[in-house]
Amino acid sequence: MSNESKCPFHQTAGGGTTNRDWWPDQLNLRILHQHSSKSSPDPDFDYAKAFKSLDFQALKKDLTALMTDSQDWWPADFGHYGPLFIRMAWHSAGTYRIGDGRGGAGSGQQRFAPLNSWPDNVSLDKARRLLWPIKQKYGNKISWADLIVLTGNVALESMGFKTFGFSGGRADVWEPDEDVYWGSEKVWLGGDTRYGKDQVKAQPPGQGDLVAEPAKHGEEQNRDLSAERNLENPLAAVQMGLIYVNPEGPEGNPDPVASGKDIRETFGRMAMNDEETVALIAGGHAFGKTHGAGPADNVGPEPEAAGLEMQGLGWHNTFGSGKGGDTITSGLEVTWTSTPTRWSNEYLNNLFDFEWELTKSPAGAHQWRPKDGKGAGTVPDAHDPGKRHAPSMLTSDLALRFDPIYEPIARHFKENPDQLADAFARAWYKLIHRDMGPLARYLGPEMPNEELLWQDPLPKADPSTISEQDIATLKSRILASGLSVGELVSTAWASASTFRGSDKRGGANGARLRLAPQKDWAANQGVDKVLAALEKIQGEFNSSGKKVSLADLIVLAGTAAVEKAAKDAGYSGSVGFRPGRVDASQEQTDVESFAVLEPLADGFRNFTKARYSVKAEKLLLDKAQLLTLTAPELTVLIGGLRVLGANHGGSKLGVFTDKPGTLSNDFFRNLLDMSVEWKPTSADNETFEGRDRKTGQVKWSGSRVDLVFGSHAQLRALSEVYASSDGGDKFVRDFVAAWQKVMELDRFDLK
């Protein structure tokens, strides 16, 4: 008998067939409980406080020295790690997308799967290992999230570029995000599913991916993003495992014009306009090179699939030395300029001054070289001083010349290099800070003085806030205004619940509910009546010489309504309210930027703008995760908002009470009542009615969002807590706490 057969452990904890295997469509509440204290080595650690004790200039000095400290185990191209570190920072921040605010550099996710093993991130494992001695030296005073971004900034500065600034404040997490939807493809570099196609194919990394099939995709010159290439929302990359576009062209087709369309869509979904996009590409490709020294079959598995002996590194390369001049990363072998470690405008000069012809890299990937052998010998080799090359370009580079919108922008930057430098500095700063939220979160000595529109600026707060007596007076006036509890609660929710924990945007501060585009959103139908009444109260109060912002008043109105509803249910006590919010102007509000915050569905108000293929309860879960809610908070808020009458348009769906406007646990008691039998009332199973089992009388009507709290085992267990005979007090306490949390999600000035 072998030793192995004697082992008492044939399987270990966490293995075997899981619930998700049996029921893949099951609501996944785990996304509400990520990054808990159990995963953190120091749950009480205050990163902002630690960062403020950092010797920032000493850190930058060490980073600058690292740039030219080439290591034998991973030699620096051209003797300078700057381009590698720019790519590292870019690929950390570049996962951000505006559709849901997820991705980005804000928590150091590049360290974890899947990002650490994306095909587009080959060799960035080495970049982070090069940084480890510096991270080790400065410890918890600098997070990986901040260090990755700062290193990219220092890399630019070390090569002669003047950056716009840097702000810290990105705290690390200690496990992979589970809430980010990266696509449904099951193979790396697959791209069919996100474009609604019927088949997924893949090639090895570095050799392109899908080859366009005219019968399925249409002729390349006739493709249109609104039709054949309509990228699934909220995705901002054309293939699984890429940051943006396929550099060889759409699906490996080397068509610069078609590539331009992909670039515009993907960069736009990362909040970049056409000028910013051109500046980022032209600025970023002023430095460094790509790597495709040999065939991709020389490259081993990614970090997550590599053996223990690799110690978290991946993509072991058996071609030649496997490093230096033998490096294989993207499979493309391109060096754009003769000054790859110094800022210049040569990228655009080469792009426009040469005519280009299609060729292939040693790995077989499509790329471009100057026609007629021009430019030969002008570009240095990255590792052999005895070799010289011609400049080369990617298909995505040529898009800047041949796309009819990008071309005049790129040509203007070619002729005005100072304007390119300014545009690149600003676009780079936006790239690496877009997911940081309001300026109250920014830390460090290099924060720019200039306020930028994409930062959703707010006026400075008046240090003299309203007093407790003022708050009591305003509450009385609000409750005497004739507005219902439901109207007040729904309006406060509409204002505060735009917050996204992903990119820290939205929320009640600023009172942008009264401004375009929020005032015109379908979800906010009816709030104009409430806002008009509150503005009248504000005007009367402010005429006395004191000042209250409408932002504060909107939240206070909801707070007063919750207090009244609790009192009417027989519970005493107050709901916490902390003033200090300000009112933004329309000039401080980028309509296009805020448009992505519009709720297309808000289960908390039983609202859907249209019919969607995604089930309503999954849209609710997504909203709850963006609001940073736990499963108990989600549950208690739904139950409370329903009985308060906060539904959109006064809908009766889910209002399982005969005393709306009273903060009772009726929603849970009546949902779990076994004398009621539920049946769908619509063919799509979106609405239901509950009938008395004996009489057949209709008692209640509800949506999928309502019924999931009795159907889903975990949510039902939570609902039972609040439906119990001793659950009333806990229900009110928990609702009040969750309500105040949502109302203050954007109050980083208090944290």
UniProtKB/Swiss-Prot annotation:
Q: In this entry, which stretches build a coiled coil?
A: none
> Which PROSITE patterns does the record cross-reference, listed alphabetically?
PEROXIDASE_1, PEROXIDASE_2, PEROXIDASE_4
Renumbered to this chain, where is the cross-link Tryptophyl-tyrosyl-methioninium (Tyr-Met) (with W-90)? 244-270
Keywords for the protein's UniProt record, in alphabetical order: Heme, Hydrogen peroxide, Iron, Metal-binding, Oxidoreductase, Peroxidase
Q: Where does this protein come from, organism-wise? A: Pseudomonas putida (strain ATCC 47054 / DSM 6125 / CFBP 8728 / NCIMB 11950 / KT2440)
Instruction: State the protein's name.
Output: Catalase-peroxidase
Q: What cofactors does the UniProt entry give for this protein?
A: heme b
Catalysed reaction, written as an equation: H2O2 + AH2 = A + 2 H2O; 2 H2O2 = O2 + 2 H2O
NCBIfam families hit by this protein: cat_per_HPI (TIGR00198), PRK15061.1 (NF011635)
Linked residues for Tryptophyl-tyrosyl-methioninium (Trp-Tyr) (with M-270)? 90-244
**Which family is annotated?**
Belongs to the peroxidase family. Peroxidase/catalase subfamily.
Instruction: Report the EC code(s) recorded for this entry.
Output: 1.11.1.21
Q: What class of enzyme is it?
A: oxidoreductase
Question: Which Gene Ontology terms of cellular component type are present?
Answer: cytosol
Catalytic residues as annotated in Swiss-Prot or TrEMBL:
91 (proton acceptor)
Q: What does this protein do?
A: Bifunctional enzyme with both catalase and broad-spectrum peroxidase activity.
